[in-house]
Amino acid sequence: SDDGKSLKQFDFIVSNPPFKLDFPDTHAKVAAQTARFWAGVPNIPPKIDPKKPKMAIYTCFLQHVINSLKDTGKGAIVIPTGFITSKNRIEKRILTKIVDDKIVYGCISMPSNVFATTGTNVSVLFFDKSQSSDKVILIDASKLGEEYKEGTNQKRRLRNFEIDQIIDAFRNKKS
């Protein structure tokens, strides 16, 4: 809906949003949806310069995912690892809400170059709106994986036994 209050709700959501993107043409419309984007919307840079970073649009996707989950919904979203320690107002509001409301279940910091074609270090946040645990499992998988080349790109991939270790840690709530 245009006001952001009547979103379709889902049992499960998995999202891989763009991290940086400009949307100056629709910024005002998006920013007006305060129920949907309760932590805020990133500001438009004063002068859009192709050499400078674009807007942190992933913060909008993160809020959208949380608002689109049913009360018993579960979800996962890929985010830049820097989100967890960000001092930015919007990121801090989102992090505070998902921890205080006990929405976030866990976070895995992934190895660099493991994901798509981005050089950005990424983490995966897991949500479970049906649980109300006081604990969030944090897994540092940033040193795992093996290097390989794909064309001219140096990449990293998790091996099956490492994936099993991560799954086991989540199931047993061990970091």
Residue ranges of each PLM-predicted region?
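A conserved structural/catalytic subdomain of Rossmann-like adenosyl-cofactor enzymes
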Residues: 3-175
